[in-house]
Structures are given as structure tokens and as C-alpha cells.
Amino acid sequence: MSCRERTDSSCGCNGHEENRILKCVVVGDGAVGKTCLLMSYANDAFPEEYVPTVFDHYAVTVTVGGKQHLLGLYDTAGQEDYNQLRPLSYPNTDVFLICFSVVNPASYHNVQEEWVPELKDCMPHVPYVLIGTQIDLRDDPKTLARLLYMKEKPLTYEHGVKLAKAIGAQCYLECSALTQKGLKAVFDEAILTIFHPKKKKKGCLGCHGCCAII
């Protein structure tokens, strides 16, 4: 397990929360960039070497409302071979990040077909945030050529907002683990969701910046 200190967000907490160990679990199809997402955030650098299917549990010290908390980041494998083992990492989760790649339409559809049903079955009361990954590939020529060959296109921000509303996600955010664009906002939102989950009456759409960064 790796651990490093990070001052992430001031979420308007009332100051009476006891120091907590926070648990954030990332789920989604294989090859959508979950591991790189976590490693890039935890290490503040994109992994240049081979990335295993599941990386080690990382812990990051975050400051919320003037109090320090330990944020545990948990990777999961999206392949079907892990369907029986994956839920073993779910107990005591405070927030889930459901990931899909904006250049992998199948991973987008599987959010509603596979991942939300699994979470509702295993952890029905835990909030989740929808994350679009690999946004740096939206303009990548090789990626665009591959999608064109399959008669597909990259998914837009509007696609993510629509899906977030449909599944009752707390919020939709996009990021790139490679460039780190939007990366910190993803985990700021995860922390905010733990302390101040929103009711799912209409969902929370486009919540960029709803956490004050310090």
C-alpha cells in the first residue's frame, strides 16, 4: 500500500466530523483506464510502465473542512472472470466511481446494463459518481480511425450527462489520467459525495466545480 499526503478539498463540512477512513472503489469495464486513473492521482504522475489489471490499494491523506482523513482508493477488475471476486472489495465503501471510456461505446452501455445493477444489488445505499475517462483520446487520429472503421464516434460530454441522469448518479465528470485534466476534480467530487451525498430526485448534472479547491 502506498500513502502520500494531499490537500484536496474544502467541502463546507461543519467541523464536527470525526477523522475517518474513507473508502472509494472504482468499477467499470476492463481497459477503460481505471488503474491509470488511480495511479495518476495517487502518484501525481501517469504510469509509464506496464500497469497490472489491479493495482495495489493506495491511501491518500486528504484535508476536508480542516480535518485530515485517510482516503483509501480501491481498484477492481472489470473482466467477467472476476465477477465472483470483485464484490468482496465492496463492503464499507463510502462512494463508487463508475467509469467508462469516452472512446469505448460498449463500456458506456455497460454502465447501465451491468455496473449499476451490480452495485444496486450489492451496495444499494452507497452513492456513485459517473466518470468518463480517456478524454485525451477524443482527438487521437488512430483512435478516431478505429472508431470510424466500426462506424462509431467518441462519446460527448452530453452523453455522460444523459447517462448520469438515467442511472441516478451523483454527478458526471470527465478526466484524462494521461494529461491529468479533470483528474483532481474527480476525487474532490468523490470526497464531497461521501460527506454530502445528494438526493437522487433529479440527479446532479455537470457538477464541475461544486467542491471548493484549496
UniProtKB/Swiss-Prot annotation:
Name the organs or tissues of expression. Highly expressed in heart with moderate levels in lung and liver. Very low levels detected in brain, spleen, skeletal muscle, kidney and testis.
Q: Which residues carry this modification: Cysteine methyl ester?
A: 211
Q: Which SMART domains match?
A: RAB (SM00175), RAS (SM00173), RHO (SM00174)
| GO cellular component terms attached to this protein's record | plasma membrane
The way it spans or sits in the membrane comes to: Lipid-anchor
Query: What does the PTM comment of the record read?
Result: Palmitoylated; regulates localization to the plasma membrane and may be mediated by GLUL.
Q: Supply the Pfam families for this chain.
A: Ras
GO MF terms held by the record: GTP binding; GTPase activity
Subunit comment? Interacts with the CRIB domains of proteins such as Pak1 and Was/Wasp. Interacts with GLUL.
Q: Where in the cell is it found?
A: Cell membrane
* Motif placement: Effector region: 50-58
According to the UniProt entry, where is the signal peptide?
none
Keyword field: Angiogenesis, Cell membrane, GTP-binding, Lipoprotein, Membrane, Methylation, Nucleotide-binding, Palmitate, Prenylation
Main location as per UniProt: membrane
**What organism does this protein naturally occur in?**
Mus musculus (Mouse)
Its function? Plasma membrane-associated small GTPase specifically involved in angiogenesis. Required for endothelial cell migration during vascular development via its interaction with GLUL. Elicits the formation of F-actin-rich structures, thereby regulating endothelial cell migration.
Q: What is this protein called?
A: Rho-related GTP-binding protein RhoJ
Lipid-modified residues, S-farnesyl cysteine kind: 211
Residue intervals passing through the bilayer: none
